[in-house]
A protein has these predicted regions:
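C-terminal helical cap and adjacent loop that interface with cofactors, partners, or active-site loops
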Residues: 22, 158-211
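Conserved active-site and cofactor/substrate-binding residues in soluble primary-metabolism enzymes
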Residues: 9, 33-40, 87-95, 133, ...
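Short, well-ordered alpha-helices that flank and scaffold nucleotide-derived cofactor binding pockets
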Residues: 43-47, 98, 196, 200
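C-terminal substrate-binding/catalytic lobe of Rossmann-fold NAD(P)-dependent oxidoreductases
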Residues: 55-59, 64-183
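N-terminal Rossmann-like NAD(P) cofactor-binding subdomain of oxidoreductases
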Residues: 1-78, 82-85, 171-173, 208-210
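PAPS/PAP-binding and catalytic site of the sulfotransferase fold
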Residues: 28, 133-137, 194
Length: 211
C-alpha cells in the first residue's frame, strides 16, 4: 500500500453505522458498492446476534457501470448478457468480511442494464429467532431517512436508480433467511454516500442535498 501510514487513521464511511466516527475523522474511506448493499442488509442481524456461525452467501447483480468506464469489448451491449465474475477473489470480499466480522461467500454478477445493484443474501438464523426479533433488528434504521425497510418487500433496481436510498426486505422459512437489498451503485454505492459523509463532517443532516 502506497499510503500505509493512513490506514489506521481512516474511518469506514458507512454513514448509517459510523456517524460519530465519520464526523471526527480526517480521512474517510467510502465503502464499495457491493459492500454497501451487503452490509446495510446484514449488519443489523449481526449486531443483534441473530446469525449462526455458518457462512453467509451473497449473490449480487450489478449494472454495467459497475465495471467502470474503460472501454471493453466484454461490456459492449452485443457481448454482455448475465455472467458471474471474480469468483472467490473479488476485492470486495475481504471488505465485507472485515466489516461484518462474519465469513461470507460472495459472488458478483454483471448484467446488461446501466446501473443499480440487487443483492440476494442467504443466512442461517439462530434456532430461537422470531419474526419480532428480525423486525426489531432492523429498527436501527427507523430514523434513517435514506433507508427504506419493509418486511416481505422485494426491492427492485428500478425503485432506487438515480436515488440515494437503500431498499431492504427479508423473507424466512424456518431458520433460513433471505434478505434482499437494492441500491444505485453510482449513488448510495458511491457518490451520494460520500455526500452523506461530508454532511456528517459539516454537522448537516445526513440527507442534506440528496432529498
Amino acid at each position: 500500500h502506497k499510503q500505509a501510514h493512513w490506514l489506521r487513521q481512516a474511518v469506514y464511511g458507512l454513514a448509517e453505522w459510523y456517524p460519530h466516527e465519520i464526523a471526527e475523522a480526517q480521512l474517510v474511506a467510502v465503502p464499495g458498492c457491493y459492500p454497501t448493499a451487503s452490509l446495510m442488509a446484514l449488519l443489523p442481524l449481526k449486531k443483534a446476534g441473530l446469525l449462526k456461525s455458518s457462512k453467509v452467501i451473497i449473490n449480487a447483480v450489478s449494472g454495467v457501470t459497475g465495471a467502470g468506464r474503460k472501454a471493453s469489448l466484454a461490456t459492449q451491449g452485443a457481448e454482455l448478457s448475465l455472467q458471474a465474475y471474480g469468483l472467490f477473489e473479488h476485492r470486495h470480499t475481504p471488505e465485507i468480511t472485515q466489516q461484518l466480522q462474519h465469513e461470507v461467500l460472495f459472488t458478483p454478477h454483471l448484467a446488461q442494464f446501466p446501473r443499480g445493484i440487487l443483492a440476494t443474501l442467504y443466512a442461517e438464523l439462530n434456532d430461537d429467532t422470531s419474526d419480532d426479533d428480525l423486525t426489531g433488528a432492523y429498527q436501527c434504521y427507523a430514523e434513517q431517512p435514506l433507508v427504506r425497510f419493509k418486511k416481505l418487500a422485494r426491492p427492485a433496481i428500478k425503485d432506487v436508480v438515480q436515488q440515494p436510498f437503500v431498499d431492504i426486505g427479508w423473507h424466512r422459512q424456518g431458520n433460513q433467511l433471505i434478505v434482499l437489498s437494492a441500491i444505485d451503485n453510482l449513488l448510495k454505492g458511491a457518490a451520494s454516500q460520500a455526500i452523506q459523509c461530508i454532511n456528517l463532517q459539516l454537522g448537516l443532516p445526513v440527507e442534506e442535498g440528496l432529498l
